[in-house]
């Protein structure tokens, strides 16, 4: 057991360390939620990760994205994520994929016999395309719903997609996947009604939503923890709505 894994091993044992090292994860989105999910996965010792994100860091990311620094502004998120992972665990098998998630790329994104999909993207159309393909393959999926417009970390919940409530993004995803078997999709979402504040639009016309660093961090680390529990063979919130 490596020195890096010593404290984890005291909790999960040598067999747990082996399971984590042999596990493989596709992570879509390396932003506010995905960056923290990556941090948890890498530090837990997940052996193989594919990071998918077509975006680059901007100054507006600095308030909430753990991978965003003044030095990474303007750089591709997927590449920065891989550099961060290797700085923690040089032996990790990690691959950047700087592509947009859509109908034309989801098959490639999920290719390669991965164990788990961790979904941290927030565009409805892209999310539905990804989760539809994931449901077809049956890959174990842990998906973040809307983390923006929330203040209360104690309202974060875990549930199967079909049992989510309150969250508008979850409602849109449920509607978009109503003809799919979503039994392999477990969600992290908030039961706090979204805060009603004015929203802006970016240069592409996409809504810009207010967000703290704290709520996305809880979402991301919860996604990582669900993945870790699944790899270790521990129940990951399939049965119904569960508070953290």
Task: Cite the ranges covered by each PLM segment.
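Conserved S-adenosyl-L-methionine
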Residues: 42-48, 136
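Glycine-rich phosphate-binding loop and adjoining beta1-alpha1-beta2 segment
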Residues: 46-89
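Conserved SAM/SAH-binding loop
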Residues: 98-106
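Conserved N-terminal Rossmann-fold NAD(P)-binding element of oxidoreductases
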Residues: 27-29, 52
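Glycine-rich phosphate/adenylate-binding loop
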Residues: 110-116, 121-129, 136, 141, ...
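Hydrophobic/small residue at the entry helix of a nucleotide-binding pocket
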Residues: 33-34
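N-terminal charged helix/coil linker that caps or initiates catalytic domains
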Residues: 1-26
């Amino acid at each position: 057991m490596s020195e890096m894994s010593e404290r984890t091993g005291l909790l999960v044992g040598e067999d747990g360390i082996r399971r984590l090292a042999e596990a493989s994860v596709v992570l879509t989105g390396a932003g506010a939620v995905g960056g923290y999910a990556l941090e948890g996965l890498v530090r837990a010792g997940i052996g193989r990760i594919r990071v998918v994100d077509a975006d680059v860091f901007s100054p507006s990311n600095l308030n909430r994205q753990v991978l965003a620094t003044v030095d990474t502004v303007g750089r591709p998120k997927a590449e920065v994520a891989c550099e961060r992972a290797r700085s923690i665990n040089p032996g990790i098998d990690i691959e950047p994929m700087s592509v947009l998630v859509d109908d034309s790329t989801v098959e490639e994104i999920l290719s390669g016999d991965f164990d788990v999909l961790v979904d941290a993207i927030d565009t409805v159309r892209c999310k539905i395309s990804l989760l539809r393909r994931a449901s077809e393959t049956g890959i174990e999926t842990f998906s973040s719903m809307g983390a923006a417009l929330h203040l209360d970390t104690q309202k974060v919940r875990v549930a199967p997609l079909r049992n989510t409530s309150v969250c508008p993004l979850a409602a849109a995803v449920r509607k978009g996947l109503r003809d799919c078997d979503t039994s392999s999709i477990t969600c992290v979402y908030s039961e706090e009604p979204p805060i009603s504040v004015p929203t802006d639009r970016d240069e592409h016309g996409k809504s810009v939503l207010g967000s703290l660093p704290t709520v996305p961090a809880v979402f991301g680390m919860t996604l990582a923890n669900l993945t870790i529990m699944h790899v270790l063979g521990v129940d990951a919130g399939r049965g119904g709505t569960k508070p953290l």
